[in-house]
């Protein structure tokens, strides 16, 4: 698989490979099976969301504030809650994340911010 995948896709993939169906009364899994991708099919890339304890303040407990990010294979948006800063990177042209593009009025920035808010407001 050459496209970005998410760790939440592993369980649905394994269940799909083993032909194990999820009971409809169970809560829906967040991920999706990667089996179609393994079989050469194409699917639209999904956003990958991550959240980690606060790496910017070593004295703060690891609960909150956190650092949250959302990405696809081209772009990555990071929100540092500790100091309420944002970072936005073009991963294709800046894989080391050295050129923060936040506030450069890129159309993608708003799209990613909206997606991040969807994840964090659920």
Where are these regions (language model features)?
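Carboxylate-dense, calcium-coordinating segments in secreted/extracellular and ER-lumen proteins
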Residues: 97-101
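Intrinsically disordered, low-complexity polar regions and short flexible loop motifs
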Residues: 94
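C-terminal cap/loop subdomain of S1 sulfatases and analogous C-terminal strand-loop tails that border
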Residues: 3, 8-11, 16-91, 108, ...
């Amino acid at each position: 698989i050459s496209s970005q995948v998410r760790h939440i896709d592993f369980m649905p993939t394994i269940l799909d490979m083993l032909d194990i169906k999820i009971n409809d009364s169970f809560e829906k899994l967040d991920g999706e099976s990667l089996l179609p991708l393994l079989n050469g099919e194409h699917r639209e890339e999904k956003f990958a969301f991550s959240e980690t304890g606060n790496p910017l303040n070593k004295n703060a407990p690891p609960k909150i504030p956190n650092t949250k990010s959302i990405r696809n294979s081209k772009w990555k948006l990071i929100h540092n809650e500790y100091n309420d800063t944002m970072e936005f990177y073009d991963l294709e042209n800046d894989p080391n994340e050295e050129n923060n593009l936040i506030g450069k009025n890129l159309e993608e920035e708003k799209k990613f911010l909206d997606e991040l808010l969807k994840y964090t407001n659920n």
